[in-house]
Amino acid sequence: MARLLTSSSALRWRTITSSQPVLLRAYSSGSSDTEYLQRSIVPTMHFQKSLPRLPIPKFEDTIKRYLNAQRPLLDDVQFKKTEQLALNFQNGVGKQLHEELVQQDKQNKHTSYISGPWFDMYLCARDSIVLNSNPFMSFTPDPRPEYNSQLIRATNMTVSAMRFLKTMRAGYLEPEIFHLNPAKSDTLTFRKLIRFVPSSLSWYGAYMVNAYPLDMSQYFRLFNCTRIPKPNRDELLTDEKGRHLLVLRKGNFYVFDVIDKDGNIVKASEIQAHLQHILSDNTPTPEFPLGYLTSEERNKWAVLRQKLLDNENEEALAKVDSAVFCLCLDDFPIKDRVHLSHNMLHGSGLNRWFDKSFSIIMTEDGTAAINFEHSWGDGVAVLRFQNEVFKDSTQRPAISPESCSAPVDSSKAVQRLHFNLDDSLKAAITDAKTKFDTSVNALSIATMEFKKGGKEFLKTQKLSPDAISQLSFQMAFLRQYGKTTATYESCSTAAFKHGRTETIRPASIYTKKCSEALVMNPSKHSPAELRSMLHECSKYHGQLTKEAAMGQGFDRHLFALRHLASSKGLPIPEIYQDIPYAQINHNVLSTSTLTSPAVQLGGFAPVVPDGFGVGYGVHDDWIGCNVSSYPARDVRQFVQCVHQSLDDIFSVLQDKPLK
């Protein structure tokens, strides 16, 4: 169910107007010390108590939106049947379920109606989390080449990550806010005033100046957190007492403290010495690398983990689970963006522990990325962490190329973990590796860069850059496969307490009409007609985006109603047994976008065997996408078709003839 109902990755925040959101600048009470990133005068969780609750949409609106999304995917006969089933649901059992969901929500004001079901969806999913769940986001290289040495960058990022941890736990991290009118709200005056507004009212104070605080409830699971495999439903374990870092190299596991017993960050020169010790260690790769087990089917991994515990590995596993995070040091450089994507999304499996809340992966040439487990949180929290770590490690690096390691005995400070494996566990690791290799070898990745224009030009044309990107995917799929297909775009609902994501459904009657005109018969339409169609697409996509960000999509509402029926042991309502319902949730095009100065590239695998996983970004003067597929689709041809589609759109906008 998880693969049918969610994109692999929810990597973005959508604003609720067309204004460009501005990330909160750090106004601190002075932060020259090396322990913290900043010392915000507004406490980190100041707005959390007063965040608005995620609304449950009106039931009739959900049904209407669902049918609008189905219209471009169905012929008249199919649509009539689906429409009737939807209306029957609206006037029958669905109405009762909706009323019960509303009542349940009123009794649980501390959270959102989607939070529990969403955790269930992720944690009950039994497929491997590799490819099916974990995405990656790679860091932009340090602008100074000499700082991209693996040892220097790993040390600096580790220190910056610990500064983030300490800043957050001390309440000094700037609250996450998006400013729609920065001149009014992104100011020291605003901060000085808002910090004195009681936390039960603070959100309203921000709202009055068009500033939107975001939910930060996921942040505590960034560190010391691991997904633990259990039969039928996994658990999230967070142990904030852990002061050590987990480092993987050549499939070997090492731990050393990065926070001392007084709660201070261990000296950067000592961290450097310990990492140098690990990089110099000539211990061979284990014959049976344990990390492969985290790529197993979850029920099988749960059984194997219990076997590990029974074989006296409890202490070693506890070290892995409670580590602040996982640092994977790979012994090779990155060749190109496709190699980067494969390595950061899955790698060889040898040097990974996919269950950690996040891992920083760093190759020999200093190329770095975050691979994160998705059940605990979404891209908003991870991106904030990535932005802060990139900024701090490049602007305030703890060590430089001239720095010397501390004269400490790292052989005593660094512990290499040993695991006792019996024959059945060795066989299980071999089996897991075989399955892992088969899965990842089936994945293809292709990248595309369109250099003829981007956000700036599209804005001069009064067009939404995201709408145009999504239209190019619709056109590309039509050009390649001759039809319109189910499309998913993830959208954060972090503007609400315990919000997660909502779905934007970019395939519409407008994109279908426009795609068919541009791809199949552009000569039948005047340039003015084609431009008018582009504006129709942009306007409707903007409406869908605004609705989704405000919790007014249809996907999560229908999902919650189905979850409620299932939890009550009721028969599955007919609407959910309708073939078009399964088809619209079989997301052939699963898409997610983000742009940040800290992020070079992001990506994820398709969520269905015959799908594409489309990570994309619209920059000032170019548009890029990083796309994955399995053998059922031709990803290289698809990215060529996307490029051709963007070419055609920009030609129309520039009054050039279509090729």
From Swiss-Prot:
**Which parts of this protein are intramembrane?**
181-210
The subcellular location is:
Mitochondrion inner membrane
**GO terms, molecular function:** carnitine O-octanoyltransferase activity; carnitine O-palmitoyltransferase activity
Q: Which UniProt keywords apply?
A: Acyltransferase, Fatty acid metabolism, Lipid metabolism, Membrane, Mitochondrion, Mitochondrion inner membrane, Transferase, Transit peptide, Transport
| GO cellular component entries | mitochondrial inner membrane; mitochondrion
Q: Does the keyword Acyltransferase apply?
A: yes
Q: In which pathway does it act?
A: Lipid metabolism; fatty acid beta-oxidation
Q: Where is the transit peptide?
A: 1-27
EC nos: 2.3.1.21
The organism's place on the tree of life at top rank: Eukaryota
Asked whether the keyword Nucleotidyltransferase is assigned, the reply is no
Family matches, as Gene3D superfamilies: 1.20.1280.180, Chloramphenicol acetyltransferase-like domain, Choline/Carnitine o-acyltransferase, Choline/Carnitine o-acyltransferase, domain 2
Q: Name one GO biological process term.
A: fatty acid beta-oxidation
| Pfam families according to UniProt | Carn_acyltransf (PF00755)
Please report the record's description of how this protein sits within the membrane: Peripheral membrane protein
PANTHER family, alphabetized:
CARNITINE O-ACYLTRANSFERASE (PTHR22589), CARNITINE O-PALMITOYLTRANSFERASE 2, MITOCHONDRIAL (PTHR22589:SF16)
Name the record gives this protein: Carnitine O-palmitoyltransferase 2, mitochondrial
Q: Per the UniProt entry, what species is this protein from, by scientific name?
A: Xenopus laevis (African clawed frog)
